[in-house]
């Protein structure tokens, strides 16, 4: 099963820059936090650590995803996790009228205005993606 954002964008008939993926990280100081980044980019772990007040941050192991969030890989939504974790959304969302994020089930997306997602998740926006080398 193709869980990539490229596949999701093609199924939706939308540009890839409108499809965001939800990643859960663990910082050395803050514990768990969430990054929502454009689907065609990778999260910059150093940038994520910096904005979340950590010296170091890593993606959580896949086996922790369900117990920590209540979601499985490919169906992790920034909305409705077991607990409200600090959330950071890549700043490119601000230039878009709507973005897509997982609805919490594989294959199901939510189309939402970035401002609404930011308000609902109490997120901060930041530059979170790795630069092309």
Which residues does each PLM region occupy?
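Extended, low-hydrophobicity, polar/charged segments
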Residues: 1-133
């Amino acid at each position: 099963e193709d869980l990539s954002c490229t596949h999701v964008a093609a199924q939706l008939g939308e540009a890839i820059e409108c499809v965001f993926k939800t990643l859960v990280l663990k910082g050395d100081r803050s514990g768990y936090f969430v990054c929502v980044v454009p689907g065609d980019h990778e999260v910059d772990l150093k940038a994520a650590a910096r904005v979340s007040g950590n010296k170091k941050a890593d993606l959580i192991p896949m086996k922790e995803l369900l117990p920590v969030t209540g979601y499985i890989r490919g169906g992790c939504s920034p909305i409705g996790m077991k607990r409200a974790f600090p959330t950071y959304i890549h700043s490119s969302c601000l230039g878009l009228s709507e973005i897509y994020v997982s609805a919490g089930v594989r294959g199901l997306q939510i189309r939402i205005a970035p401002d609404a997602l930011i308000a609902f998740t109490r997120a901060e926006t930041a530059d979170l993606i790795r630069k092309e080398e």
